[in-house]
Structures are given as structure tokens and as C-alpha cells.
Amino acid sequence: IQCVPAFVLDAVERPEPLDAVVDDLETRADAVDHFEFYWFPHTATALTKTNTRLPAGTATRPLTATSRLVDDVLVGNVVHQSVCSAGRAAPGLVPGINRLSARVWGDRTFSDASHRVFATSRGVRFREMEYAVPLENLASAFRGVQRVIDENGWHVEFPIEVRVAAADDLWLSTATGRATGYLAVHRYWKVDPTAYFAAVEEVMLVHGGRPHWGKMH
């Protein structure tokens, strides 16, 4: 196993205008160590996460226990579970709920050991599909997913995750031979994801996508 020395991550999580983030994806990815964002369908907001590596031993500013409880447990799990249940019972509520979710999630700055920043607790059950596309195709692929959601009138209650990674030299890696953008779509486990995932998969394949082997595809 190839490992690196322990390190600290400085994390900046904030909402930003979606179009500006998508239009500048490659530049944002090249400028920092780790960049990703979440997008709740039916909103115009990207919930960005920018992580910068710092040497081990750097003084940290970790989240307080109260902040973790409110953000990660109450909002990220308890409230989101209620939101997903409500969206399944009344799909027409989803756009409004998503707009509210985009306003209350993802606005904080902190630093801590990498494993405390990267890892998050997920208590809401879901199904997921993720594809890896060449980084230069990521913005177009994302726009394609937006289009299929709009064209089909789907009310999607779970956010889409977009992240980037450097090229790899391992044959079985989804990033082998190319800088890569990852696009993951999710549905609440009580919602049939078949049509949504199939439509997204068509978009990914057009953009040179490779499926994540451990997820639905």
C-alpha cells in the first residue's frame, strides 16, 4: 500500500453561484489540492468544498462538538431523512425543499487531521451511480445531466456530487491515463433510480465516461 505522511486539511465549505463554478471547473481544480461541489437539482447554487493540505503538526481549528452535531448529524442526516421521505410522498415539494437545503448546508471554515475532514457520517440510505470522465469534459457532462433532469421533469431529492482527481497509471483505475472528473448521482433508496440512472449513463458514455466498479451502472 502506498501511503503518505499524516497531514492536516484546511477546509473551506461555502455556497457559490452554480454557473460560475461550472464554467471555471478546470481552473478551480488546478488551483487547490482537493476541490469538489454538491448540487441540489432545481437550484442555482453549488455547495463547494475546497481542501488544502498542511503539514502534520500545523495548529488546527477543528469544528466544535456542537457544530458537528448540528451540521453533520441533525442537518446532514436527521433533517435530510425527513426531506427525502417528504419528497417521496409529495414529489412536487422537492424543488422548494432543495432550495431550502442549499441555503442551510455548507458554509463553514475549519482545519483538522485529514481523516476528520475527508470522512463524513451518512445515515440516510441511498442508491448511487458514479462515472469518471476526462476532466476537460466534466462541465459539459454536468450540463448534460441538468438537461436530462429538466427534460424528463424529474424531481430529484438527492444532491449530485462532482469531484476531480489526478491521472493515475494503474490499469484498473477509472483515472488511468487522464486527469479525471467524477460525477455521482443518487436517489433515496425507496425511489426507483432506473430511468434516472440510465439517462445519466447515456450522457456519461457520450463524454468518455468510465463507471465506478463498486457502484450501480
What does each of the following model-derived ranges do?
Residues 1-217:
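Noncatalytic alpha-helical scaffold of FAD-dependent oxidoreductases
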